[in-house]
Amino acid sequence: MKNKLASLIAITGLALAATQVQADSLVDGSIEDGKAKSLTCTACHGPEGNSVSPMWPNIAGQNAPYLLAQLKAFKEGSRTDPLMSAQAMLLSDQDMADLAVYFESLPAAAQSVKDASTVNRGEALYRGGNTENGVSACLACHGPTGRGNPAAKYPALQGQHADYTAKQLTDYASGARVSDGKTRIMRDIAERLSKEDIAALSSYVQGLK
């Protein structure tokens, strides 16, 4: 009897914990359903949302509002990628919400900076921007530790692969990526960054914890 009671308490505790994680999210989705739907995602993003390829983003721990917004952008065509656009076309709104809260619930993998020799430059840009050419400090939107801003749909950057981040900044600068919408906030910033700035920033945020 005692063993049955202990098991019931343990199961109830786990259920409440899972519910709490979901309740804390700003997106109305099911973690359990998202996990069941995530098999295809793991081929590129890894079984726990942490990609083994530096060109594919880590999405574990990424805030759900941002993930949901990007999935919708891929489906609607305001953001394009041969693989992601095709996958997003198959997803319903509920599928996207479930996947977003599932990956948000997973622990993000910690990484070190890619190039230690550029830390000072990357940190200066991230924390102070560049007043000479109008580059805003990254932490204003992405936070001092790169955790992002879920309510504003600003992504977490900490631990993100430097190669992936550099590609996104380059795409914003060239206009190949326009998913910042009418605000143009990322395009306006990225086009003012040099290649060296992009490399230093990308390396620095990879090591944020």
Where are the predicted features?
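The feature marks the first
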Residues: 26-77
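Gram-negative bacterial Sec-dependent N-terminal signal peptides
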Residues: 1-23
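Axial heme c-ligation environment in periplasmic c-type cytochrome domains
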Residues: 52-58, 74-115, 150-156, 174-199, ...
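The canonical Cys-X-X-Cys-His
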Residues: 34, 41-47, 99, 135-144, ...
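Stable alpha-helical elements in mature extracytoplasmic
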Residues: 30, 37, 63, 70, ...
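Sequence context surrounding c-type heme c attachment/ligation sites in exported
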Residues: 35-39, 64, 68, 129-139, ...
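Electrostatic cytochrome c docking/interface patches
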Residues: 21-38, 52-55, 105-132
